[in-house]
Amino acid sequence: MSDVFQIYLAGGMQDLSFEEQNNWRERVCRSIITRHRMLNPRIKEVNVINPVDYYNFQDALHDTEKEVMRFDTNFVRNSDLVVVNANDPKSIGTSMEIAIAYEHHIPVLILNTKNKSLHSWWIEMSDKIFDDEEKLCTYIADFYITMNHTSVRSWVQMQ
């Protein structure tokens, strides 16, 4: 068991601008890291993987698509949690990342802020679907990082 809790940020990339690929990932990463530091920096370390930091369509650092695919799928298989943005529900790569996580019993949380129609398999392979970034990040901090489920219970009661 690792001393680092690793979160992979999946979501559409191919037909999106660099900003559309990256901005939500940066916000979620900042929010999770900030919550981790505020809650208790002595608990398990958190590493948030933003694949745009490694490969994107703006800076062609790769030679082949296979290189990108293997790099990303390796991160998925070695993560403790996969967060998926439903910004492009028809993305083949995102669908593959969800399936790989599911097959490896890695929890999948979906962020669907625009209430896009999702394939039934996305829904079935996810552990929870959120329509709000802040609720998602609070849930991750409480449920996965600190294992303090009291704020999750109070959030559910408010619904």
Could you say what each language-model-derived stretch is?
Residues 1-159:
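Conserved catalytic or regulatory cores that recognize and/or transform ribose-phosphate-containing ligands
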